[in-house]
Amino acid sequence: MNKKLIALGLSVLTAITLLTGCAGEKKEAAAPPVKDLKVTYVKSPLNIPSIVDKNNQTLVKEFGKDKISVTFPEINSGAKQTEALASGSLDVCSALGGTSAILAASNGVDVKVVGIYSRAPKAFNIIVKDPAIKTAADLKGKKVVGPKGTILHQILVAALNKEGLKPEAVNFVSLGIPAGVNALLNDDADAALVAGADVLRAQKAGARVLCNGEGLVDATIVIGVSGKLLKEHPEVVKKYLAIHQQNIDFMNKEQEKAFGFTAKETGLSLDEVKIMAPWYDFSTRITDKDIKDLEETQDFLLAMGMQKNKIDIKSLLAEVK
């Protein structure tokens, strides 16, 4: 009898312990559902898929089916995009320079690269007016203007390096692209770093392309997302990428319409859009070549003293499942 009572007592005690333990376990709270998705709208230098999306309202319509509203802050600066991402006022950097993504990650911003937006070495150019400047070697001692710490700046350094020159061989002045073109055309600079439609503008005014990124830099633009969004709602990121692919498919299948949208949005003529469009590869899959290009971009940033903390580039990339 006593043995039965003892056994019963132990059973009750075990049950109480188990129940208490279960009650004591804290379940991780589920992340709140996404109600508003903030995606940058960047049309330059010639971001045709984004322009298609704006005209067709693809993201708005598709996410609307899930009762998610989409807003489009127009932030062109890569640094400002990643600042907004860090502050939580942005979820997706739709078209972010590889330089900006790497710098942000090295400074602790929780950004993940989930795809490639474009590769366009032909779209990023060093332009000049002086007929005596025939190669990058002729830029020695000259004033070169353009945006610092960007793909364009990287192309300049790579072009100089190819000629056996260090970055210090030129007088580099940081200027935005439109201002740089104006400086060149007004003889306030010997060369300007120019991308997209501004290349055609400069050429029309008498400037010419000295060289572009071909054989130097792939000019990789990435799709960056908040690490928090990816961790808590991978399905939203997956859907975003699928919708982005819809825009690319539309561009490929309805080329005349896509080019028409782009001409209207950028102020270019239809013929000019047709000249520039082949410069761009909008395939989103991250390849080994892309990884190598991003690693070389990091080498550039470190060498120029613009990046202090080296990162593992592969840790910046994320596969969306």
Enumerate the predicted regions with their spans:
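Flexible hinge/capping segments at coil-to-helix
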Residues: 30-31, 128-143, 231-235
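Pocket-flanking alpha-helical
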Residues: 47-53, 73-110, 122-136, 154, ...
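Ligand-binding cleft/hinge of the Venus flytrap
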Residues: 51-68, 153-172, 203-204, 260
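Secondary-structure end/capping motifs
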Residues: 232-306
